[in-house]
């Protein structure tokens, strides 16, 4: 059984639904012909690249549902179906790849080069839970998630044109923060059944400049829910 952190699920969601101003990610796809009862499909990113996120999976041209029909094994760059496929079925996996990324499950390191920004990280700052019945019932966890957005001050390599307008520094951090809230409001169903019940904890507040990282900083906070967190079954 693969360990599946809620942060891993959210990283995949954000990488898929938020456009990187620095365009570090490109799209590619792999095609397979399933063997009898095959469940695991290993991806083959371009040499020097690694898996960023899964965009879509089809089996005989029918879309499969992420976290319901299959899960992602990021460490081994695999898509794993919960139920074995039939011999001869055509599987097409479309995914993002890159030599680096910009959305991570860990906090930004102060040693990062300026070209590593903008950067987003995800923190679980609390996770109460309750058993939904007797001792055999599942536990529903309610993680409180904090998403940090880090952007550098205005300089030549930190000004980005988005939709015809230029963004940098605090302005860019705020723009990304609201695109994150929009992504959850518009695409929450992509998280189900792994996570559900998105509930925002206010809109992105103004925060002071971070002297340690020399970055502008915004946060997005919300609650969500999930059963058997950390497990694929």
Spans of features found by a protein language model:
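Surface-exposed ligand/attachment interfaces on beta-rich extracellular proteins
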Residues: 31-47
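Extracellular/virion structural assembly segments
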Residues: 19-24, 97, 135-142, 150-187, ...
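Short, ordered beta-strand-loop transition motifs
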Residues: 33-38, 69-76, 208-214
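Acidic-leaning, charged glycine-interspersed low-complexity segments
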Residues: 115-121, 174-231
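Oligomerization/assembly interface segments of phage tail-like spikes and tubes
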Residues: 137-157, 213-228
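Small/polar-rich, solvent-exposed N-terminal microdomains that initiate assembly or binding
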Residues: 1-27, 44-80, 94-136, 187-195, ...
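Surface-exposed, short loops/turns at beta-strand junctions within beta-sandwich domains
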Residues: 84-87
């Amino acid at each position: 059984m693969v360990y599946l952190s809620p942060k891993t699920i959210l990283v995949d969601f954000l990488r898929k639904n938020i456009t990187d101003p620095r365009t570090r990610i490109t799209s590619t796809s792999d095609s397979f012909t399933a063997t009898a009862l095959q469940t695991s499909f290993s991806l083959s990113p371009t040499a020097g690249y690694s898996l960023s996120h899964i965009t879509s999976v089809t089996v005989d041209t029918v879309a499969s549902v992420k976290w319901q029909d299959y899960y992602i094994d990021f460490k081994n760059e695999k898509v794993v179906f919960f139920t074995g496929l039939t011999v001869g079925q055509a599987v097409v996996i479309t995914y993002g790849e890159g030599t680096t990324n910009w959305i991570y499950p860990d906090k930004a390191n102060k040693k990062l080069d300026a070209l590593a920004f903008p950067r987003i990280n995800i923190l679980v700052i609390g996770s109460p839970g309750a058993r939904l019945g007797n001792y055999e019932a599942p536990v529903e966890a309610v993680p409180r998630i904090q998403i940090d957005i880090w952007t550098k001050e205005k300089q030549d390599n930190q000004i980005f044109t988005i939709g015809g307008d230029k963004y940098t520094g605090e302005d860019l951090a705020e723009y990304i923060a609201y695109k994150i809230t929009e992504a959850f409001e518009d695409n929450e169903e992509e998280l189900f059944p792994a996570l559900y019940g998105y509930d925002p904890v206010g809109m992105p507040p103004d925060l002071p400049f971070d002297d340690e990282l020399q970055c502008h900083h915004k946060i997005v906070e919300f609650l969500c829910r999930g059963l058997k967190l950390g497990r694929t079954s």
